[in-house]
Amino acid sequence: YHLGYVLGPRINAGGRMGESYLSFNLLSSPNIHIAAQYSSVINGKNQERQKIQTSIINTINSGVDDNQNLINFFYDPTWHIGVLGIIAGRLMRSNKRPSFVMTDSENFIVGSGRSLGGLNIGTLMMEAADKGIIIKGGGHTKACGFTLEKKSWEPFKLFLLDKFIDSTIIQENFYELLLDLTLINNNLLNDLDLLSPFGQNNPEPIFKSENVKIEIVNVFKDKHMKCKLSDQLGNSVIGMMFDSNVESFKSYISLKNEFDCYYKVKRDTYSSQVIVHIEDIH
């Protein structure tokens, strides 16, 4: 199993859904049968988390009608606190602008933010706390969490807008190398393996291919897409897009015939075929 994308979300699910003891008991149990029981419960919690997350994202997407906002703020007192960070990250990636997602916790507003970079939003949260705008907050360059009184919502919003107004937050897509599709093969993947493990201080390389035709081959769970990327010479590679707005993507690729495509090179878990995970297209 893939530790980051398969096991990780399940181990985290207990804590996200407010029952962190489940994951602790799973990992510390000396009895494989008891561990299996906890594993089953945790998997159910992860499915519950996914349903809540999908519902909130669909609600937000159906209500967003102004993509010119400098920053996106989303708030609903009924949203589950455990999924705010995931949702903020996905909205940031899809909208290409900082996104802050908030809900109520007792008498306060709590939230999570994700940013493209440019400004350190973790530092901004600490500055806001020092100025008394929020009760507490912190994080790092691209992610933050915060708590504030409801009466401080407008001052907090104005504080962030003022900070971002002169900042370049809509960044150009960064990539390591311009590639022909013919170079996406086992040799490239073997070379990339030498650079691993990837993480915060060693990010996985992103590549770019120009003048690529994109065809949707299949859609999974209404949000994941299998695509065929083809160049002008007929060379092709399979590309995957995850957690995407399928209808918006279909509409976008109908606007023109060729795109610049940004992606990571991967090996398919099931077929062992070399594929790409699409990060963005223009």
Where are these regions (language model features)?
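OB-fold single-stranded nucleic acid-binding module
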Residues: 144, 152-155, 186, 247-249, ...
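Noncatalytic, beta-rich nucleic-acid-contacting surfaces in large DNA/RNA-processing enzymes
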Residues: 108-112, 214-216, 274-279
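Hydrophobic helix-and-loop "lid/oligomerization" segment in the mid-to-C-terminal part
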Residues: 1-154, 158, 174, 178, ...
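Anionic-ligand-binding alpha/beta catalytic cores of soluble enzymes and soluble regulatory domains
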Residues: 153-208
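Structural detector for short beta-strands of small beta-barrel domains
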Residues: 201-223, 260-262
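Beta-strand/loop nucleic-acid-binding surfaces
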Residues: 234-253
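A residue-level signal for conserved active-site and pocket-lining positions in enzyme catalytic cores
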Residues: 12, 192, 263
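Short aromatic-glycine-enriched beta-strand elements
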Residues: 220-227, 272-276
